Amino acid sequence: MDSVNSFKGYGKVDEAQDLALKKKTRKRLLLLSISVVVLIAVIIAAVVATVVHKNKNESTPSPPPELTPSTSLKAICSVTRFPESCISSISKLPSSNTTDPETLFKLSLKVIIDELDSISDLPEKLSKETEDERIKSALRVCGDLIEDALDRLNDTVSAIDDEEKKKTLSSSKIEDLKTWLSATVTDHETCFDSLDELKQNKTEYANSTITQNLKSAMSRSTEFTSNSLAIVSKILSALSDLGIPIHRRRRLMSHHHQQSVDFEKWARRRLLQTAGLKPDVTVAGDGTGDVLTVNEAVAKVPKKSLKMFVIYVKSGTYVENVVMDKSKWNVMIYGDGKGKTIISGSKNFVDGTPTYETATFAIQGKGFIMKDIGIINTAGAAKHQAVAFRSGSDFSVYYQCSFDGFQDTLYPHSNRQFYRDCDVTGTIDFIFGSAAVVFQGCKIMPRQPLSNQFNTITAQGKKDPNQSSGMSIQRCTISANGNVIAPTYLGRPWKEFSTTVIMETVIGAVVRPSGWMSWVSGVDPPASIVYGEYKNTGPGSDVTQRVKWAGYKPVMSDAEAAKFTVATLLHGADWIPATGVINQLS
């Protein structure tokens, strides 16, 4: 198996359909001050009118039809990629007899939850039908991801219920909903990736009835999730196009819960001054702390805590694999320096572990902060996919950390993440994932791979056009780690809507003049990708010989680049300053 042909790959892209859907939602309405719910109802009416006009091929406009539950649902679903499944699934629910768009959106969430709940035990059932450990492992990954998706969706419904008490759905809450639904899309896709990567070892896996049965069973929830994401994304787009200002509430990391005000005061004052900080648990391998291992400290973290729980890890190398599940909220872990406090593991794909589970350190719970720690996967290039660090933590920050490995070193899987002054070392796709993530002031260092391999720094995995994910590398440095003679590229698009921007970064001579490479050799990526460069410097920044892809812009405008700043991509002004970490919002 050629290690460069990892499990990641393109799916089908229906660009014409996506373009048509976008046109349907770009409507101009003349409105005065009006509640969000009424505004959306008017938008729905306008969309319905447009659909009717187009169907009748009318040359002159006519008054919009009466707003009925049926026309409302049709209009809501018309902005989705799968309108038929949207209409059929929601219309079956008893409470669907409404014209209220927010209610219809909540019903779309109920559809996903019901569907995922009905198949949540399927991975475990299918696992009993095989003795193959690789298949069992992939099914276990899918089971965990389905559970995570269900938990996130229930949190989403709770967030909407809390917001309804305020009689409005703020733009910041809409961003939360988009993020969480984007992560649910990623959960589905990661399950499929875990099943697909089985093909790397044995060709018979490609025709496995067990894996095909699970994929088939998850097809409906995949469409339903995309539908809900499209609904909330298009509503936000309509409001934005109209220029209607929406009150943005100040919020910290607890999102739909009232976050303790103690955190902001504590974080601003102490995050950058850890020398005087009193941790809740101290880890020391020499016995001078409260516990000997990081895992022992993690076990002491309370579930879904609204107050910051602090773990201090003293200098030393801790050989262990750490997993912090979705119930571990608001945890800070810090060490004595990225070269002094090291957490080391060696799990890898070649030896039988799914890529998703190879991480030396994995975090799912929201509000995570890591400082002055090094994470390493020592498996080496010959072991192919071997993740050092994986994060699905929403509103997470990584400061002065290092992530060291070869293929697939750093995995910003989903949600919103910020990396500042960190070091990342690797070979193939060594920063990959589907999070909304910004790297600032980081040192990104490709290293020499195996003799038959190349280096690709990024592999972004946006699967759905409405996902709020993307990768931004801003004001960083890209340079070789040691003597690198292998062909080295800024990245390659992993999925149909992959989104990656390199901006204001010093690019070293290690990067080939073409800059980027296709996932499939000789085949340009789809035009639906969003790739670009902006005001980079250094010997590798010359764009005159760059690839000529339809979805790539070698010279982005100021306005285009602004979409990939901390302020815009992460809405970082709402939460990053509270952590005390240095950042540039623009």
From Swiss-Prot:
- Record keyword DNA-binding present: no
Cite the EC number.
3.1.1.11
Q: Which domain of life is it from?
A: Eukaryota
Write out the catalytic residues in the record. 408, 429
Compartment annotation: Secreted, Cell wall; Golgi apparatus membrane
Q: Catalysed reaction per UniProt? A: [(1->4)-alpha-D-galacturonosyl methyl ester](n) + n H2O = [(1->4)-alpha-D-galacturonosyl](n) + n methanol + n H(+)
**Pathways per UniProt:** Glycan metabolism; pectin degradation; 2-dehydro-3-deoxy-D-gluconate from pectin: step 1/5
Q: Which GO terms describe its biological process?
A: cell wall modification; cellular response to hypoxia; pectin catabolic process
Hey, where's the site called Transition state stabilizer on this chain?
A: 407
Q: Where are the transmembrane segments?
A: none
Q: Which residues form the signal peptide?
A: 1-49
Q: Where is this motif: RRLL cleavage motif?
A: 269-272
Q: In which tissues is it expressed?
A: Expressed in siliques.
Q: Where is this motif: RRLM cleavage motif?
A: 250-253
Q: Which InterPro entries match?
A: Invertase/methylesterase_inhib (IPR035513), Pectin_lyas_fold (IPR012334), Pectin_lyase_fold/virulence (IPR011050), Pectinesterase_Asp_AS (IPR033131), Pectinesterase_cat (IPR000070), Pectinesterase_inhib_dom (IPR006501), Pectinesterase_Tyr_AS (IPR018040)
Where in the chain are disulfide-linked cysteines found?
422-442
Q: Which GO terms describe its molecular function?
A: enzyme inhibitor activity; pectinesterase activity; protein C-terminal methylesterase activity
**Residues reported in the UniProt entry to bind substrate:** 355, 385, 492, 494
Subunit structure, per the record?
Interacts with SBT6.1.
Protein task: Acts in the modification of cell walls via demethylesterification of cell wall pectin. Demethylates protein phosphatase 2A (PP2A) that have been reversibly carboxymethylated by LCMT1. Acts as a negative regulators of genes involved in salt stress response.
Q: Which family is annotated? A: In the N-terminal section; belongs to the PMEI family.
Domain writeup: The PMEI region may act as an autoinhibitory domain and prevent untimely PME activity during transport. The PMEI region is cleaved by SBT6.1 (S1P) in the Golgi apparatus prior to cell wall targeting.
Matches recorded under NCBIfam families: PME_inhib
Name of this chain's protein: Pectinesterase 1
Gene name per UniProt: PME1
